[in-house]
Amino acid sequence: MLLTIDIGNTNIKIGVYQDERLTAHWRVTTERHRLADEYLVLLHNLFDLGGIDPREIDGCAISCVVPPLTGEFRTLCRTYFRVEPLMVNATTPTGLRYNVDTPAELGADRIANSLAAFRRYGGPVIVLAFGTATTFDVITADGEYIGGAIAPGIGISADALFRLAAKLYQVELVRPPSVIGKNTIHHMQSGVILGYAGLVEGLVNRMQAELGTSCPVVATGGLAELIAAETEAITTVEPYLTLEGLRLIYEMNRS
């Protein structure tokens, strides 16, 4: 069985694959000061809940954008599962080519997302990942990663309003009853949720104009479903796109 781990700034996504089938998956809060032993306890409990025998794990693929946790999870895999994890980065063979100024700056999660989307939908394809930041990645028909965009995440945008505007407060990230809000809560929900849908539409339209063609737009991440419901710019939502990308990369490099 293959263990896939996507370590983000806000959440850690964990998946266990039996061949090509995702048999169990979890999402936990990222705690960048936790040690390998602490994550081991957490993972052990999750495996118990999911009925996963840790002795059956014979491979591990990790994407990490939180440098302090890279070593901790490498240690966890070596000591607990007795496997050497594949730590994905821009030098990891994926079959994609990178036509950007500094490939090393690409997050491992974006690489995994790009490969998974390209393998499933072909190219050109645009990938959106709604996380702490929202990333846009563009892959051409011949598997060339040509760039993208980064925008502040939905949560960051809402938190900034709450922290920096004295009379505003935290609100639930849900669709308001109407675009024209009747109270402060609905005003903020309209601006954040529907405004973000407009941001997505604007960037996707501009990217497709530069490509010279329309193409599939694949979204992933915790708030992907919420935004996809508000715009036709998103073609489909793939909740486990990053984990699937890690699986594909591992299979390409397992030898």
From Swiss-Prot:
GO biological process, one term: coenzyme A biosynthetic process
InterPro entries in the cross-refs: ATPase_NBD (IPR043129), Type_III_PanK (IPR004619)
Keyword Transmembrane attached: no
Pathway: Cofactor biosynthesis; coenzyme A biosynthesis; CoA from (R)-pantothenate: step 1/5
UniProt binding sites for substrate: G107, A108, D109, R110, T184
Broad enzyme group: transferase
Gene Ontology molecular functions: ATP binding; pantothenate kinase activity
SUPFAM superfamilies assigned to the protein according to its UniProt record, in alphabetical order: Actin-like ATPase domain (SSF53067)
Main location, first listed in the record: cytoplasm
Domain of life: Bacteria
Subcellular location as annotated: Cytoplasm
Catalytic activity annotation: (R)-pantothenate + ATP = (R)-4'-phosphopantothenate + ADP + H(+)
Catalytic site: D109 (proton acceptor)
Record EC number: 2.7.1.33
Protein family according to the UniProt entry: Belongs to the type III pantothenate kinase family.
Biological role stated in the UniProt entry: Catalyzes the phosphorylation of pantothenate (Pan), the first step in CoA biosynthesis.
Assembly and oligomerization: Homodimer.
Name this protein carries in UniProt: Type III pantothenate kinase
Organism in which the protein naturally occurs: Roseiflexus sp. (strain RS-1)
Lineage: Bacteria, Bacillati, Chloroflexota, Chloroflexia, Chloroflexales
